[in-house]
Amino acid sequence: GGAVQTGYQYAVKNGYQYAVQVDGDGQHNPEFIRKMLQVLQEKNVNMVIGSRFIENQGFQSSFARRIGISFFEKLIKILTGQKVTDPTSGLRVADRKVIEEFAKQYPSDYPEPETIVSLLTSGYSVAEVPVLMNEREHGESSITFSKSVYYMIKVTMAMLLARIGGGYKK
C-alpha cells in the first residue's frame, strides 16, 4: 500500500489527471488500459476496475481465492449497494479526485476492497470493465493459506470500519 500511495502522491505533485494502477507480477495486460480510460471518461466515473469475472475468461485464480473474492463481492454489495465483481483486482484507473484521496489516505495492507467501500461510501463512482488476466509471472502471492483467515478477518473489519466511518472525508 505504501508504494502505491507514493505513486498517487507523485501524481498529485505533478498534476496528473489520471493514474493507472497495475500489480507488478505480470498478471495485468496493459492492452486494457485504453478501454478502461475510455470508460472512465465516457461514463464520467471516478474509478474503473479491470474485472476478470465479468466475462469469466483468461486466468481465474485458485478456487480458495475465488471464494474469498466472492465473499468480498457480496460484502461490498451489502455495505454500498453496488456490485463489484472483482474487488481484489489491482488493475485500476483513477481520476484526479480519487488520485487526491489515495494520496492522502491509502491502506497499507490488502487495500483494494477497503478502498472500494471508502470510495462508494463517500459518493464516488466506480465502474468495471471486462479484462483478461494472466497467471502470475513473477513472485508469489502475499496471501498464503495460513494467512488467508487473518486476511479475511482484517479486510472484513477494514471494510466495515470504512463504511461506518463514512469513507473519505470530502
Model-assigned labels for residue ranges:
Residues 1-14, 18, 30-109, 136-157, ...:
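Acceptor/aglycone-binding surface of glycosyltransferases and processive sugar-polymer synthases
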